[in-house]
A protein has these predicted regions:
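Subtilisin-like serine protease catalytic core
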Residues: 29-145, 149, 156-159, 166, ...
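N-terminal mitochondrial targeting presequence
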Residues: 1-6
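Active-site neighborhood of phospho(di)ester-bond hydrolases with catalytic His/Asp-centered motifs
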Residues: 45, 324-326, 354-359, 380
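Catalytic-core regions of hydrolytic enzymes
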Residues: 303-311
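Conserved structured catalytic cores and adjacent interaction surfaces
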Residues: 307, 318-321, 325-326, 353
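Active-site-adjacent substrate-recognition loops and nearby beta-strands
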Residues: 22, 26-29, 57, 331-333, ...
């Protein structure tokens, strides 16, 4: 399995896919070509991002697009506190029960942190559902073939007139039992997915992680934390899911960081995509991105207050200039509590600009969601122009000024 994920190519798109004319971005960049987000760091708080996506590899001035990718939900955390040493054959016991064969990458290392996790909980629901369907089809084909063979064997026993009665009875019972068990396996099939072993070790002062689904890890490529290595892996099994690693607690915790859906990549592309074709660029192709996953895969990519606060603290630690949060929901009280207080601190104390979506609960008044309704945030609704109607929504344009789209949430807020 390669340590570097396959680059996902971008399809051709209309130059009007992003409303750069309506927002004044096109005119601004025509006049100030290098004022395109260079030296600006944007924290994208969302489902996480596909690190292999086209247009999100480099900035316009050649820097890495992502400075880091953090899972603020804890959903990808793996307990690697168990420390083991090599046995007489140079192997180590994996948490899966496998006896793991190490490669030359482990030379000179005496002890290893080990842990394990199932693959499926790490994957976005779209990839997980597709793989489960494919694996079920493969299992069903094999199982049906075995059931057909078992039925033929049973039919042959019943038709064999040369067998003594007692012998026929015993063979028939065995064949019927086999057929029953095969049918039961089909009916009770429950695929939990591959079990991954996670091996962590420190070498040359750098923590490194190896993730494998088999006993032979000789050809595995150790991955270091993303911020320093920019290493991206692929889980294989047809998942087409990129991931990076983070190491915490002195090697006792590993975070396998994946996205929980495509929304975060979509947002990151709008903000800062930089493609070979400038027409496919985002608003600020020179900007860098800190990807903070706040969409928890265990909650169908919903966010928690804890995840939001972790992401805001990370944005402060990395020195972000801007925060984008395209999440929101109804609220009983949006101006009190730790989440609101931390957003307020990000603006008033840490000097960041915070942009939050209004929500999609319009067109009624006072439908704006939280945390977009807090006073410190710049709350952004959805607008549509005649050209956007044709290019983005497949509706007939008409000669009228742009307007707020019907689904966009609106104010005023309760305060």
């Amino acid at each position: 399995r390669p340590a570097r994920a396959r680059r996902v190519e971008m399809m051709a798109t209309s130059p009007s896919a992003l409303p750069k004319i309506e927002t004044g971005v096109a005119a601004h960049l025509d006049q100030y070509e290098t004022h395109d987000g260079r030296n600006v760091l944007v924290a994208v708080l969302d489902t996480g991002c596909d690190l292999a996506a086209a247009g999100l590899q480099k900035t316009s001035d050649g820097r890495n697009k992502y400075v880091d990718f953090l899972d603020c939900t804890g959903g990808g955390d793996v307990d690697t506190s168990k420390v083991v040493e090599r046995d007489a054959d140079g192997r180590i016991p994996g948490l899966s029960g496998r006896s793991l064969v190490l490669g030359a990458w482990a030379d000179g290392v005496d002890s290893f942190h080990t842990g394990g996790t199932l693959l499926f909980p790490l994957l976005p629901s779209s990839a997980r559902g597709r793989i489960q369907k494919e694996r079920k089809a493969s299992f069903s084909a094999t199982q049906h073939a075995a059931m057909t063979e078992a039925q033929r064997a049973l039919d042959a026993i019943e038709a064999d007139a040369t067998l003594a009665a007692d012998e026929k009875s015993e063979k028939k019972k065995d064949a019927e039992l086999l057929l029953k068990e095969l049918k039961g396996m089909m009916d009770k099939h429950d695929d939990h997915g591959p079990m991954l072993d996670v091996v962590v070790f420190e070498k040359d002062g750098v923590w490194r992680v190896v993730v494998g689904d088999g006993a032979d890890l000789t050809s595995a490529t150790p991955m270091a934390p993303f911020a320093t290595s920019q290493q991206v892996g692929d889980f294989g099994h047809g998942s087409e899911t990129s991931y990076c690693v983070q190491v915490y607690d002195g090697g006792d915790t590993v975070s396998l960081v994946t996205d929980a859906g495509s929304h975060g990549t979509h947002v990151a592309g709008i903000v800062a995509a930089c493609d070979d074709d400038p027409a496919r660029n985002g608003v600020a192709p020179g900007a860098q991105i800190l990807a903070c996953k706040i969409g928890d895969g265990r909650l169908d990519s919903a966010e928690t207050g804890t995840g939001l606060v972790r992401a805001l603290i990370a944005a402060k630690r990395y020195g972000c200039d801007l925060i984008n949060l395209s999440y929101g929901e109804p609220f009983p009280s949006a101006t009190s509590g730790r989440v609101a207080e931390t957003f307020a601190a990000a603006v008033r104390e840490w000097g960041m600009a915070v942009f939050i979506s209004a929500g999609n609960a319009g067109p009624a008044l006072s439908t704006v969601g939280a945390p977009g309704c807090i006073s410190e945030a710049i709350c952004v609704g959805a607008a549509v122009s005649p050209q956007m109607m044709a290019d983005q929504y497949s509706t007939l344009p008409y000669d009228a000024a742009g307007t707020s789209y019907y689904f966009s949430s609106r104010g005023p807020t309760p305060d």
